[in-house]
Amino acid sequence: QKRVRDYLGKILSSSNHLLSLINDILDMSRIESGKIHLEETEVSLSDVLHDLKTIISGQIHAKQLELYMDAMDVTNEDVYCDKTRLNQVLLNLLSNAVKFTPAGGTVSVRLKQLPGTAKGSALYEIRVKDNGIGMSQEFVKKIFSPFERERTSTVSRTQGTGLGMAITKNIVDMMGGTIEVQTAQGKGTEFIVRLPFRIQPEQHRIEKIAELEGLKALVVDDDFDTCDSVTKMLVRVGMRSEWTLSGREAVLRVRQSMELGDAFHAYIIDWCLPDMNGIEVTRQIRSLGDDTPIIILTAYDWSDIEAEAKAAGVTAFCAKPLFMSDIRDTLMTAIGQNQAEQEKPVPVSYTHLR
């Protein structure tokens, strides 16, 4: 039975590899003959990145890599674009990063909306970075040419047609964007893609929410950019926001706010903090008698920690990369749930009323 399973696994792996080679060749052929056309539809960039994370997670776990995904300053997450081709570009870049990063390495994807575009459109920058084997400057000059692969012992052992980057470059060009690469042998590689998209109409934009307006939140994350980004999102929905990079500082802020009578209405805490994790921060906040909603941010699958987190007093989870719609929906649910709990009638015991 074990031998049969091994054979079936090898057959499946070989079949998938052969299929990917054929698809690359067909795509390149269609591109060169002008038969590929973009089909724009309504697309949520939040969905694109969360789906990408789901698709690539198997490869990430198989190679024991760390994957970090983030979204910065994205005020327009609903756009018009060819979702299939955008996914193809991102998967090509991310799969390459995984492929050429040794076990224990780190791969990151960061999406940022750039300022200064014409009304009705927006420019987005996507950076895919790894700390893998990198590339020589000689190879970088021809990386976007068809069938080109770097001739090193490490790369030669890695499967591929050498068409992925050529296809990616052609799709980016068709979308009216640009792609560049920064790399050094032994230090890793970063691909930087900039793409212009038409944004969806005004009714899709996030406005201030009456139920959240004026409420105060504390953001706790050891990454300054995340604190800054989440704070901007909270201000956009009408909340007041403070932030700190430390779990211990967060607990101190909570204690001070309670003593001053200016308590927080929500806590947004990263799971992986350097001084104490988000669950321990939650325990310490709850030990102060504070029942304010606590939302844990995590770039990982939270199923393994969910029971422990709930027992510690965590109200809800929110997955990175974090978008406006994610934080808005999670806040509305968490704060609404907390208010409902407070409004429940207190059960009366008749035992001592005889």
Language-model features, listed with the residues they occupy:
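Short alpha-helical segment of the dimerization/phosphotransfer core of two-component systems
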Residues: 13-18
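Conserved catalytic submotifs in the C-terminal HATPase_c
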Residues: 5, 39-44, 61, 66-77, ...
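Short conserved segment of the HATPase_c
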Residues: 135-149
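Short alpha-helical Gxxx[C/S/T] motif in the catalytic ATP-binding
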Residues: 159, 164, 168, 305
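Helix-loop junction within the histidine kinase core
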Residues: 29-40
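Disordered, acidic interdomain junction associated with two-component signaling
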Residues: 58, 62, 70, 118-120, ...
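Glycine-rich ATP-binding loops of the HATPase_c
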Residues: 176-182
